Amino acid sequence: VHVTEVDINVYKCYIQKMETILISRGQVAELLPLDVCIDAVETAFRLLGEGKVAHPSTLGVHVGNGGFHVKAGAAALDREWFAAKINANFPRNPVRFGLPTIQGLVALFDAENGRPLALLDSSELTALRTAAATAVAAKHLARPDSTTATVVGCGRQGKAQLRALGRVLRLGRAFALDADGARAQSFARDLTSELSLDVTAVEDLPSALSETDVLVTCTPSPTAFVRRKDVRPGTFIAAVGADDEGKQEIEESLMAASVVVVDLLPQAALIGDLHHAIARGLMRAEDVRAELGAVVAGRAQGRTSREEITIFDSTGIALQDLVAAVAVYERAQDRAPRFNFGD
């Protein structure tokens, strides 16, 4: 058989098309600047608000010391994409095994032909895209003159949250709280230096809230700790931690007394802080002002007065993972190892 150079090049091209890029946690952090992620997530919510994408609900599987969450979705951006994320959430990992609380993978596919394009570590990507969603929500739901933030939960997610808020608000100071006081102190030192922001570790949440414009909660708490009586008028709250039915951060009466915007209503009504208020009979799904996508797309209002307490119930949607994964993939072509599953 006579094999020409053209034949060889065609074969090489075919093999390259079959290859899947493998992208590590460090590469995700390097290839996904926070500003890029915020822009991508804002575009994603706009598409959702315009009705151009669809989402299945999340799948949750609970096991002894934690659980697994599966989210998947497709969207037409410059081309058709599909992404699926499997995240493991084991809150006791750092103490028991020296492992991160959240671990997992994102699989990115070409939705025109089904080809697996990339496998990415999900932990850094999840932190970035979740923080980006908070930043997008803050643009529409926080008072524009907000200067003081409080972060409850001082892990990787908490750090990403404060960094993201600093991209969209002119923060002057922040308070940090964590069940582990030493971690809050470390958080305050690191972020004060990194962001040139006055970050103080505190232990008393009600006292911090008396001076807070923006509150972010990113904990695995099973019971509400943000109470209606402690939150002052005009506060914006990003409730990030409750992403399954066994978690809760916001008191039900506070949810009912606030303007609530969610990322995805059917999902938030099942697993977000919203579902606790619904279960208590204090809210109905119809009481939610809007999904964030509708607000971003200009089809619904966000904040309408300085006095409103606004809450973004953030349960996390697959579209956030998809657009973040695409942004990383497009920057990783010549910088990440490849694997051919067809070999």
Predicted regions, residues:
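Adenosine-phosphate binding glycine-rich loop
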Residues: 246-343
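Glycine-rich adenosine-cofactor-binding loop
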Residues: 131-134, 142-168, 178-183
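NAD(P)-binding Rossmann-fold cofactor-contacting core
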Residues: 168-194
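Rossmann-like adenosine-cofactor binding region
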Residues: 196-282
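Residues at the starts of beta-strands that form the adenosine-phosphate
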Residues: 148, 172-173, 198
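Predominant activation on well-ordered alpha-helical scaffold segments within soluble catalytic domains
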Residues: 38, 42, 131-139, 159-163, ...
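N-terminal ligand-binding/catalytic initiation module
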Residues: 7-127, 135, 145, 290, ...
